[in-house]
Amino acid sequence: MTNMTQQSHGNGSIEHYDAVVVGAGVGGMYALHHLREMGLSVRVYDAAAGVGGTWWWNRYPGARVDGPGSPFYCYTFSEELMQEWDWAETQPSQAQVLTYLEHVADRFDMHRDIQL
């Protein structure tokens, strides 16, 4: 059940959410996804102009996943998405990771609950 409410206060209105998440990086996106699955109303706030967290901010030459294996072994947004997404490399570049995270945000309509 979604419990977002809105109240008038002075010159504006105040919105109330079940949960507020700071940061639209991988962890924040996963929190949004999971909290929504629990039926909660959620708002994510981020200072960046796009989703991705460190993958949005760090665009220096050579930025990439430096650990072995799948880059998101801890965060599975959905099995279907993992099966259909084709990672070109086992250690993808910053651009590839950011493209994936933007796809996740679009796929799960996350932008409606993220304020950048």
List each language-model region with its residue ranges.
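N-terminal Rossmann-like FAD-binding beta1-loop-alpha1 element of flavoenzymes
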Residues: I14-V44
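Non-transmembrane alpha-helical segments in soluble domains
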Residues: H33, G52, L98-A105
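A conserved beta-strand/loop element that lines the FAD pocket in flavoprotein oxidoreductases
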Residues: D106-L116
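A structural signal for short, well-ordered beta-strand segments and their strand-loop junctions
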Residues: R43-D46, Q115
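Extreme N-terminal leader/targeting segments of oxidoreductases
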Residues: M1-A19, E37-M38, D66
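Glycine-rich active-site loop/strand segments that organize a redox cofactor
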Residues: S41, A49, W56-Y100
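Short polybasic/polar patches that bind polyanions
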Residues: R36, W56, D106
